[in-house]
């Protein structure tokens, strides 16, 4: 069996790993491609300690982000219901639709919290009434808020 060489990746490499990962690769692949193209560099005990420290800092940062998202989720869910006023036609049908931008603006006005609109998932809203929307605050944290669409 061929000996493997341990390298640290500088860039994300398909099917190999992400930047900062320590991976075992064939010596020829490392010497002829990864290292000359500055995609990776060889590991030493000092480099391994640095990588471990960096990974621990990243883990701590992810934990803090998740805790912040959980706090934001509880704040959003304690508000209860967000009201959005739309122009209404016949049979309580609204003109246009409720957009993620409108919901984000209403949330910001009522709670003062900034939310990324790309994480908002709205159902098809065509009439006045009550609807549930999902807001992805973190890959592992999803808040569910209630929207009340009213006519004005």
From Swiss-Prot:
<keyword id="KW-0689">Ribosomal protein</keyword>
<dbReference type="InterPro" id="IPR000244">
    <property type="entry name" value="Ribosomal_bL9"/>
</dbReference>
<dbReference type="InterPro" id="IPR009027">
    <property type="entry name" value="Ribosomal_bL9/RNase_H1_N"/>
</dbReference>
<dbReference type="GO" id="GO:0019843">
    <property type="term" value="F:rRNA binding"/>
</dbReference>
<protein>
    <recommendedName>
        <fullName>Large ribosomal subunit protein bL9</fullName>
    </recommendedName>
</protein>
<dbReference type="InterPro" id="IPR036935">
    <property type="entry name" value="Ribosomal_bL9_N_sf"/>
</dbReference>
<dbReference type="InterPro" id="IPR020070">
    <property type="entry name" value="Ribosomal_bL9_N"/>
</dbReference>
<comment type="function">
    <text>Binds to the 23S rRNA.</text>
</comment>
<dbReference type="GO" id="GO:0005840">
    <property type="term" value="C:ribosome"/>
</dbReference>
<dbReference type="GO" id="GO:0003735">
    <property type="term" value="F:structural constituent of ribosome"/>
</dbReference>
<comment type="similarity">
    <text>Belongs to the bacterial ribosomal protein bL9 family.</text>
</comment>
<keyword id="KW-0699">rRNA-binding</keyword>
<dbReference type="GO" id="GO:1990904">
    <property type="term" value="C:ribonucleoprotein complex"/>
</dbReference>
<dbReference type="GO" id="GO:0006412">
    <property type="term" value="P:translation"/>
</dbReference>
<dbReference type="InterPro" id="IPR020594">
    <property type="entry name" value="Ribosomal_bL9_bac/chp"/>
</dbReference>
<keyword id="KW-0694">RNA-binding</keyword>
<dbReference type="Pfam" id="PF03948">
    <property type="entry name" value="Ribosomal_L9_C"/>
</dbReference>
<dbReference type="Pfam" id="PF01281">
    <property type="entry name" value="Ribosomal_L9_N"/>
</dbReference>
<keyword id="KW-0687">Ribonucleoprotein</keyword>
<dbReference type="InterPro" id="IPR020069">
    <property type="entry name" value="Ribosomal_bL9_C"/>
</dbReference>
<dbReference type="InterPro" id="IPR036791">
    <property type="entry name" value="Ribosomal_bL9_C_sf"/>
</dbReference>
